[in-house]
Amino acid sequence: MLPKSKIKVVQSLKHKKNRINSNLFLVEGIKSFDELLKSNYKIEFTIISKETLANKKHYKNLNDLYVVSSAEINKLSGLKNNKSLISVVHKKNLKKKSIDFSKLLIALDSVSDPGNLGTIIRIADWFNIKSILCSKNTVDLYNSKVIQSS
């Protein structure tokens, strides 16, 4: 059974100010979660549907795993049709560093659509562009739709 405290955490992380204050963010869906498992991000807890767990047996070894119905996942999710899983993850401390202007970088101003920012991140990775500068008016990097589309 999923504790109410975990539900509240997931619901709160749909809002930028709560992601900033808690230093946590959401990863939703199998594809994004599989990428997360390859990274060195620390997972706080994961909520997974019974159906997904039956198909992805290696997920059973994860710590802090809560198994619920697909309907419960869909109700909690910020995405349209997420019936698989939601994971709460610790942010990394992104350090501001000096910019090497001799290398290619991307500068963004007022990108408001999370899907567009995710696509730009994917393209930057494809072209091995290591620096992306975002104005304060650009959508939150840790928005779950940015995470999913990147």
Predicted segment positions?
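Boundary-proximal intrinsically disordered activation/regulatory segments immediately upstream
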Residues: M1-A54, T138-V139
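A residue-level signal for conserved active-site and pocket-lining positions in enzyme catalytic cores
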Residues: G29, S87, I147
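Short, aromatic/basic amphipathic alpha-helical patches
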Residues: A54-L62, K145
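Acidic/glycine-rich phosphate/pyrophosphate-binding loops and surrounding catalytic core
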Residues: S84-D100, T138
